[in-house]
Amino acid sequence: MKKSIITLFLAVVSVVSCEPPMPPSDEEMIRHFATHEAAFRKVYEIMEESSEGSFHYPPLSPEEVIILDPTEQSDTSHETNDEQDLPVYGLLKPDRLQLDSLLSEIGCGLVLVDRREWETADSVYVSLVMPYYSHGIVDAGTSKSFVYDPGLRSRRNIRITEHGDLNEIYRRMYNDTTLYKPVKEGWYIKLDHSR
């Protein structure tokens, strides 16, 4: 009798533990954004004012960056501060250190920057994607991100919903889905699900 109860218990535990973890609810993400709003806005400010081009930060491949190890015992007395601090995508070392701290505070490991500049209009368009939750593999899984994109509503084929939790919507549809939910002027939650 005890063996059958233990076997049943183990079977239930293994089935329950096989389900993918639930992404954070929209409400949890909105509260998180509100708590760390100043940090999110500072990330945008740094990227808008100091960065160049479209890129991932921190860089995903070591070839994209030259980092001088401050603990290295080499003679750099002949180098100027500019030579010791080579910009990475236009970001100087103080900006990078601040970004590292801000990304840690908001719980996002990286930021994807899409920067577009128009010479004729002297204007810059910057959008950000900051992955917050991810489960699965490259071509099949679920992710939720914080997005800053002031022009998102004007794009075609973008699904923005203001009602219901994105998790529940994609579970009902259960097919490849990309949905956005507004958080605050230009800021969104993005849910990406693919099977």
Question: Which sequence ranges carry the predicted segments?
Answer:
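Extracytoplasmic electrostatic interaction patches
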Residues: 93, 104-195
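Positively charged n-region of N-terminal signal peptides that target proteins for export
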Residues: 1-4
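Alpha-helical context
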Residues: 9, 19-23, 164-166
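N-terminal export/targeting and maturation segments
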Residues: 18-103
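Bacterial N-terminal signal peptides
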Residues: 7-15
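Short, flexible coil/linker elements and helix-boundary hinge sites characteristic
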Residues: 14-17, 107
